[in-house]
Amino acid sequence: MTKLKIRAERNRTMTLTDNERYYYRSRLLSADSAEQFINRIIHGNLFDILPKLPSACCDLIFADPPYNLAKDFNGQKFKSSSTEQYADYLRSWLPEMKRLLKPTGSIYVCGDWRSAAAVQMVLEENFLLQNRITWEREKGRGAKSNWKNNCEDIWFATASNNFVFHVERVMLRRKVIAPYKDAPGVPRGWDETESGRFRLTYPSNLWTDISIPFWSMPENTDHPTQKPEKLLAKIILASSEKNDVVFDPFLGSGTTAVVAKKLGRQFFGVEIDDEYCCLAEKRLEFADSQTNIQGYSDGVFWERNTLAEQANSKRITHNKNQRQRVLLET
């Protein structure tokens, strides 16, 4: 029997009971039963599973491998190594990603400053490198002997020059600090709304609007490097279409699969840890009824700490729709 952690009453971190582990474990695929893999989680070693997956089976890959640092993933220890050794590790699986990806597909690979040189080098050996996204993590207290490590990178690459990318789906709604107007009093590039003054801006490769999952967020789990749903939503919306297949070879607690499901994509993922697989299955079940993504509403992404404005915008839209229905009925 697994001992449950004692948590504060308001802590919304997702956990598992022993009965839930038994139930969700029964839904997992194994390396020997991975043929029907669409919309499923495969529990096992990635290197055992990759040869059994068909070529050109996915449209988008999001890979968040163990970084080149010492880390404990629920007992699975990963040690830091030289840049050359880490590059060899990447070469052990990244070429297979090219085989699995469709000719019009894209791949995003996560890393930090230690792994930057190796990730870029090995990606360029196999794909067409398009960009590098840097996102602010906004977590941690820093150190006295060095600069606080406050960001991570995501490399964006494609199988060819013919790839999907929809920048209009990932616009960012920002508050207007200096509300300039043209001579007739017309707002210059911004809108006056009941919830404030906002401007829609094109996203850059520097993302400062992402919040790391924490105890008060229902998407939070005990996974040590869990990626935010908002981050995956940007990538999936920009680089895939409805019903496209999204693959995550290091699924962790399931964020990629959950967001793909919420956004109407198909998915599959591989994860070696039993506990994280079960958490991913539970999150997928909850995604049937909890379809919202924190920080994304009304078809746009919002800045951090704007939940009140988002809620007000939803109320305004709801009331406006109700008024329109009444007018139509009368």
Where does each model-flagged region fall?
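PRPP-dependent phosphoribosyltransferase catalytic core
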Residues: C278-T330
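Core catalytic lobe of class I
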Residues: M1-Y22, L28-L279, Q324-T330
